[in-house]
Every structure is written in C-alpha cells, then in structure tokens.
Amino acid sequence: KKPGLVVHEDDDNTPDTLIHRILHYLYNKGEYRPEEENSFVPALCNRIDRNTGGIVIAAKNAAALRILNQKIKDRELSKKYLCLVHGVLQPKAATLKDYLVKDGEQNRVRVFHQPVPNGKTIITSYKTLKTNGQISLLEVDLKTGRTHQIRAHLAFYGHPLVGDTKYGTNAMNKGNTHRYQALYAYKLRFDFSTDAGILSYLNGKEFTVDHVSFADEI
C-alpha cells in the first residue's frame, strides 16, 4: 500500500481503505460474493501504520487466514523495512533490545532501557546500507512487532526517521520535504518450518518492492 492509506476503517470512518480496495478488486474478479450467505470476507493478516508504505498480506479464504495467522505467530514469515534516519548510527549494524510502553492518550509509545510496569520487550535489528553523513538508509528487521516500534526505537537512540513529526524534533525536520515518515515494508519472505497446507507452495518465496523512492535520496 502507499503511505497515507489506512488499512481498515478508523475512528473517522474513512471510506477509502486498503481492505475496501481489496474487497472491490476480488468482487470484480468474481472471487468475493458478499450476497451469498455465510460468504467469507477476505481479511488482512498484518497491518502497517497509515503513514507507512509497503507490503501487506491479505487472505482470500478462511483456511489461508488461519494458516497465515499461525505462521506469523510462529515467526515463520520475515519482513524487512527500509527507512531514512537522521545521523549516522554506530555501530553500522546492531540489534537493539529495550522496553516499550503505549501511551494511549498521546497516541504514541515510550521506550526505556530497563523493564517498566506495563512495558513490553522490543528487539530491533538494523543494518546501514548507505549514508551521506547527515542521513542514513537502513534495512530494519523487527524481531518483535510493537506499535510504532521502528520509529520510537530509533528515535530513542537519537536517530528519528526523516519526516517523522511524532518522534522527531522540529529542528531535525526543518526543511523536510517528506509528507510522511520515510519508512517502507519492502521485503517479505516465507520460511515455513512446519506444514502450511494449501499455502505450502509459498515456502521459500520472497517478495520485494524493487523501488522505494526515498532510497535514492542518498
């Protein structure tokens, strides 16, 4: 999906959503018949933020949804992200482990080095692909999948995403031309260690978005 598109209806009852587009597409192909009694409604298996672009998985039938949800839970699918951050990370590649707490009132999360009440462990691996000394392009692998994890975790270490007004600073974003934070779920791989039934044909397959616009800015 493109940045700016919500995956599901939100509190504003946004009519244009990713799932609505998917249902419309499948209806036109004759693969979704809402008028039929007990018809399965295709559903999303994962979500990404409104302002994040990238690969999202949808299931067209109940069996696929059940299998994919279990595979995601068992971490038999891997997703990688590209992002632009302020500054140069040292070391160039590392795995960060900290704790995250959701702040519902502020619609944001907070990160801590030590365990805190209601805190959940977050693990984020990153690798610097290139840098110009002021901004860096990273490939990020989430070992845990928490709300705003990449954005908040990297900002916690002093390297917020370019264009991120929630976790960045006004000074860093001065002169920014990005409408959304520079974050994209660009790679998905299926590595099944157990039987996947009707989806076994996906095992070992990898899907990659060939061109992410902000990756060319360095």
In which residue ranges do the predicted regions lie?
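A structural micro-motif recognizing beta-strand termini
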Residues: 86, 140-143
